[in-house]
Amino acid sequence: MNADKFVETTISDFMRLNSSRDFEYFVSIAKQLYSRGCRDYYTEAFLTHLKTIFPITEENAEKWLKYGEMLGTVGEKDFRTDIFEQMMKDFVDSNKLSQIAAKFHGFVESVDDWNLLAECLFSRVRALEHKINLTASAPMATDPSESSC
């Protein structure tokens, strides 16, 4: 099968797939497409479709961390950064956040990457502080037995 036909078939097959398939299978398709020079499909169309099948959630965090690592190793820093940035903004679990920050830290290669990492982490801390402040300032429920009525 020639390269163009392989790419056309692979992309067509991939776009028909749904969540019943394994994430690792999708990553293997991504690697095949990338190795054949199909950067546009490997990144934009592929990643968009992959996000609909496997939303970037805490439940799918490990899968996306692995995929983010793979994106970083093949030079797709913008898309890798988008994944990590979304994770850092959306995740609540502090253990997952520290894993994400550690993984992302491993790919930091420029001042812009450092700035993005710091911005995401500070944004997350501010959001958590705001949530804590809202909880702390909520009116306390009074004990009905202490009522003066």
Swiss-Prot record:
Lineage top rank: taxon: Eukaryota
Protein name: Uncharacterized protein ZC262.4
Species: Caenorhabditis elegans
Lineage, highest ranks first: Eukaryota, Metazoa, Ecdysozoa, Nematoda, Chromadorea
